[in-house]
Amino acid sequence: KLVGDMSEGKLTIEGFPAGAIVGTFEMFDAVKAGVFDAYHSFDVYWVGKQPACTFLSSYPFSLDRPDQWETWYRELGGMEIAREAYGQHNMYYLGPIQHDDNLIHSKVPIRSFEEFKGKKIRYPGGIIADIYRAAGVSTVLLPGGEVYPALEKGVIDASDFVGAAVNYNLGFGEIAKYIIMGPPSTPCLHQPVDLMSVQINMNSWKKIPKHLQQLLEAAVAMHSWNQYTAIQKADLKAFDDFQKKQGVTVIRLKDSDIEKFKKFAPPLWVTWAKKNPLALKAFKSQWEFLKTVKVGYYTEADLVDAKGKKITL
């Protein structure tokens, strides 16, 4: 609707829910092949098709604020990397879309790093799943539409999903009575900035006049922040409703738990970065940003494995 209004009807978009044309995990190939024009989804879903997607949305213990990601995309070369990544698959990357941090909904209490071991938990795959597997979790990859029934039937013990407002409306508090979060310093361990994006088939993109291409990119940027702030407001009420209306307990891990998870991160960052040259380019760019005075999360001495041995890029 926003695009239609902004273009005075010269460019209109007809949207379909996931599964209406193809399944969630088939969208990438369908748009690449021109089965339909575009999709709106999470970049983290496509790491198996394009390893650089690992670094197009947040991953454990890296950039963890929306403004940091926006800066990387718009000022530090991230947009060009994303467009090259999707361009290799006949798609044009319109821009990042801010969403929310992700929660873990659990049927059982998980109060420490040690209590994750042996649990069967849905994660989106890639580097995120790898870090939890290193901690002893049995990870499961499921499309979003299959998460609720899997939790309800006890097929999995817990699941990552999106933020509080969306999850409350989906009824997660009716079947999983625990929300697992990090401490205030690290509210979300695995996807603190769960970015989405819009990809359009390259042939479809080239048919759009230049001024409408620019309008479409501007509309995506506007939608990104409108969506983000609306979700943050809705989350405030949702957390209250989870606890007061559905009897959900919010468990916060300790900083000491975070440090135990964190030791798995650097070697896995580098393993995923080395899967292809573009992934490495993205990670190197973010690693330099992470070491700046402005961010200051790491120094070069922190790029070591669990035994303290230096890792080379």
Model-derived features: positions:
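N-terminal secretory/targeting leader peptides
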Residues: K1-W69, G77-L313
